């Protein structure tokens, strides 16, 4: 999967609509680049937004405690407390709506646009985030919501856990991959390098060898 474009609007420290287009210069021809800035300028927000669009989950919401709404980026005073794991808390303070759109192309050449959005209802409370997945090429069609996450998982080729251990590593999370169990680490590497086929072949050969040995043993027993 290759990310083509990211558009964010009113998410934490990112105010208004901002776009990062990897299909346009200077990023198009850049082999390697860095996103830099002061603490709190929105670098991690970009990574979180990508995860929200693809999985409705993000590293900043993992393993955190309940905290007062005022300490989150909420725009309402009516919600006394929310779960810090609630992805809606990424909405920038003072704004009525925020969203992210990620356009990406799969290894099969199919192009999709995944969007995630959140808004404030008339009552002043935060509405549940909304998601949409649209296939842009080779055909233009909106993916049924019931199939949305399964379609993204298949298109990306990674689950959220795998994605955040290999493609996007949150702050202080590089050790997650290193701490992974050997079997999990091997499975991840196989999936990323496309070599899982060799494990399947190896298992097939092993089963055939076992069957052949059993047949030989049966024949030897019959001849005695």
Give residue spans per PLM region:
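Extreme N-terminal "head/tail" segments of very large remodeling/mechanoenzyme assemblies
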Residues: 1-150, 154, 160-162
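Extended, Lys/Glu-rich alpha-helical coiled-coil stalks
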Residues: 34, 38, 63-72, 140-143, ...
């Amino acid at each position: 999967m290759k990310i083509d474009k990211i558009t964010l609007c009113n998410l934490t420290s990112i105010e208004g609509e901002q776009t990062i287009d990897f299909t346009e210069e200077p990023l198009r021809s850049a082999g390697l680049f860095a996103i830099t800035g002061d603490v709190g300028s929105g670098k991690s927000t970009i990574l979180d937004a990508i995860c929200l669009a693809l999985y409705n989950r993000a590293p900043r919401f993992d393993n955190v405690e309940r905290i007062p709404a005022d300490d989150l980026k909420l725009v309402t005073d009516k919600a006394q407390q929310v779960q810090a794991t609630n992805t809606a808390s990424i909405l920038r303070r003072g704004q009525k709506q925020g969203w992210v759109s990620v356009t990406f192309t799969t290894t099969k050449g199919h192009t999709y646009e995944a969007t995630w959005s959140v808004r404030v209802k008339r009552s002043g409370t935060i509405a549940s985030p909304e998601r949409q997945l649209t296939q842009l090429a080779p055909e233009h069609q909106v993916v049924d919501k019931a199939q949305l996450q399964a379609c993204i998982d298949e298109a990306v080729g990674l689950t959220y856990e795998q994605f955040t251990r290999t493609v996007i590593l949150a702050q202080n999370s590089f050790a997650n991959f290193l701490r992974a169990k050997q079997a999990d680490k091997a499975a991840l590497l196989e999936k990323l390098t496309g070599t899982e086929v060799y494990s399947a072949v190896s298992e097939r050969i092993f089963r055939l060898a076992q069957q052949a040995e059993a047949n030989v043993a049966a024949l030897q027993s019959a001849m005695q």
